[in-house]
Amino acid sequence: MGLNDSLLDMQLLTIGINHHTAPVALRERVAFPLEQIKPALSTFKSVFLGHPAPNAPEAAILSTCNRTELYCATNDRAARDAAIRWMSDYHRIPADELAPHVYALPQSEAVRHAFRVASGLDSMVLGETQILGQMKNAVRTASEAGSLGTYLNQLFQRTFAVAKEVRGTTEIGAQSVSMAAAAVRLAQRIFEQVAQQRVLFIGAGEMIELCATHFAAQGPRELVVANRTAERGAKLAERFGGRAMPLADLPARMHEFDIIVSCTASTLPIIGLGAVERAVKARRHRPIFMVDLAVPRDIEPEVGKLKDVFLYTVDDLGAIVREGNASRQAAVAQAEAIIETRVQNFMQWLDARSIVPVIRHMHTQADALRRAEVERARKMLARGDDPDAVLDALSQALTNKLIHGPTSALNRANGADRDSLIDLMRGFYQHAPRSSDTSDR
């Protein structure tokens, strides 16, 4: 490894796709189930083994319904292309299919993006708070996987502090239309009275809990929760005065429900076209309103083509959510100003960190010179040389070697470069004569 390789600055980089750049059909293919994130981080780091950069990259993966993002810090200048290639290979998606939807954000752009995401400015639901918890979970997972280092740790700690500042000093989260509220609004377009409908929730996570809260407020005729873990499903149903049912009963009982909201962590659809066709037939073509908030999707997309079935995904709900975002543009401007200031602060810290390897290398080189000359002096003393002469030789050798680099650089430099070096050296050696003092007299 050469000197230049060892002194390359660490660079921040974010690679990802989100609801702005890719439809749900692609987002679900690049999503990482929680149990896959640690192994994925390990394979990502292995990509850089054998590269000229001296350090394995720091990395964290954020995977939600609306985004899959890889945050990394590396001194490998080929990291951008390598990261995109890795994501393509890992998910077995052709690079030419994935690349048009991928954003690659270096340095300050990566910092700004992280701050905006955590603050809810990049969310489908402007100002929503769920993303902050998801980002904290991503950081915790990266830490447990051993892929979080100084740079990303500092980035995320600053990110969480900025999110707290934005939410505490602006109205960014006020009057926001959540995905859950948007689902209720859509249901009201299909059914005049949600209170007369039977509602089924599939899953028992945070998103289903939010949806159940909003639908329960409408006083539905019946509220049922089906979950893979029966105990958790029963607990959630009890909270809202509903009842639980086994997930295995879903195909046989789907026809009983007018509204079905699903959001599970399943990697494959749990509601297929055939099951819904049978449910529609059993209902004698009374409409079914279905909301699929999962990524990857819980409901096969072909279901949406059935007559009397109204199927909506997270992207469909986004249109309703955006209607409520326009009224909070003043808060957005205020939040963006805060973020911009904090980005500059972080970049100052990053710039300061960039000189650490240089200083460390200077110390290492100087110490190597010192040890070599001390060893030479010891040998001179051992053979009986005069101590004063040995000390004089030691000091002369150290002086010559320590100033060899600067003087060689000055001798090689020309014109403006030489003037800049002279000014730089003057700062190093406070008693160096000014240029005018060195001219011929």
Curated annotation (Swiss-Prot):
Keywords: NADP, Oxidoreductase, Porphyrin biosynthesis. Its EC number is 1.2.1.70. Pathway: Porphyrin-containing compound metabolism; protoporphyrin-IX biosynthesis; 5-aminolevulinate from L-glutamyl-tRNA(Glu): step 1/2. It holds the Pfam family GlutR_N. The active site is at 65 (nucleophile). Coiled coil: none annotated. The record marks 113 as: Important for activity. The keyword Oxidoreductase applies. NADP(+) binds at residues 203-208. Substrate binds at residues 64-67, 123, 128-130, 134. Catalyzes the NADPH-dependent reduction of glutamyl-tRNA(Glu) to glutamate 1-semialdehyde (GSA). Belongs to the glutamyl-tRNA reductase family. This is Glutamyl-tRNA reductase. It comes from Burkholderia pseudomallei (strain K96243).
